[in-house]
Amino acid sequence: MNTHEEVMLWHALYQLETRYWHEVDANGGRNAHEFYLPDGLMVVGHNRFQGRDKIKEFYTWRERQAVTAISSVKTTRHLINNLFVESSGDSAARVLGIVSFYGAVVRAPAPQSKPPMLIADLMNDCVLDADSGWQFKSHTLQPIFMSHEAPPSIAIDTRR
């Protein structure tokens, strides 16, 4: 892979990641499941959501919590840093990076001087689909630092 191809791949996968988090932050993740392959996997800590239906179900639950729960996160921002992209073939790539998650229990603008709720390692396997473009085969957040306030994706216990 030459330098131009590496830059184009990095840009395409950076755009996939930023569009995904924009969907989550600006639209509550209502269409976040569409960023995944039909059998795609979303992992946050110990929670696993396999397939678009389960991913959509999580974001529906998350949005409902923001509306109905008194102390639930209502304003979020996900910041992406140190994105590293590695091609693993013509139509597959691995993405590594860091996601910092900020959340507040009030609507924006939220007065906040607290540190992020979560800083996690990001590990994605991405696949290029001829019709849909780049999609997540798997999208994993492995918590590294957490505040005492757990983000919704960690607070839910899918093991019960």
Please give the residue ranges for each predicted region:
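Short Gly/Pro-enriched turn/cap motifs at secondary-structure boundaries
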Residues: 73-75, 114-117
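Short, low-complexity N-terminal intrinsically disordered segments enriched in polar/charged residues
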Residues: 1-26, 30, 34-35
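A solvent-exposed, acidic/Ser-Thr-rich amphipathic alpha-helical stretch
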Residues: 29-102
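Extracellular loop and loop/strand-boundary signature of outer-membrane beta-barrel proteins
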Residues: 110-111
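Beta-strand elements of well-folded, non-transmembrane domains
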Residues: 101-107, 126-128
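Short beta-strand edge/turn micro-motifs at domain boundaries
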Residues: 92-96, 117-155
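Short beta-strand segments enriched in hydrophobic/aromatic residues
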Residues: 24, 36-37, 101-103, 140-143
